[in-house]
């Protein structure tokens, strides 16, 4: 009985974990129209973004704000537009995921 309760608690806690972003979410949110995992398109490759921000403790927050509000000047002349279809939580998930791309 104790094992059943432990298993039930473990399963219940999994349902409260945040959904992790991945390439599918990036595709659905139109990020892949300008970015790719490993090559520059209109915007930088995600692996290059991850390398640039590696080791910066506030990198996920910075990138999440760029996803939400857009930005310019970091990667060249073409500005990144704001992304209004992305929620704040999704922006943070996407930014955290981008930082893991190798």
Where are these regions (language model features)?
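C-terminal alpha-helix
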Residues: 97-101
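Axial heme c-ligation environment in periplasmic c-type cytochrome domains
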Residues: 33, 42-53, 66-95
């Amino acid at each position: 009985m104790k094992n059943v309760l432990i298993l039930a608690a473990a399963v219940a806690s999994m349902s409260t974990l945040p959904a992790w972003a991945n390439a599918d979410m990036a595709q659905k949110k139109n990020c892949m129209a300008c970015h790719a995992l490993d090559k520059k398109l209109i915007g930088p490759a995600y692996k290059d973004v991850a390398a640039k921000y590696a080791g910066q403790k506030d990198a996920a927050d910075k990138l999440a704000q760029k996803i939400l509000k857009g930005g310019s000047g970091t990667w060249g002349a073409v500005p990144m537009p704001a992304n209004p279809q992305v929620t704040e939580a999704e922006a943070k998930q996407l930014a955290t995921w981008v930082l893991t791309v190798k």
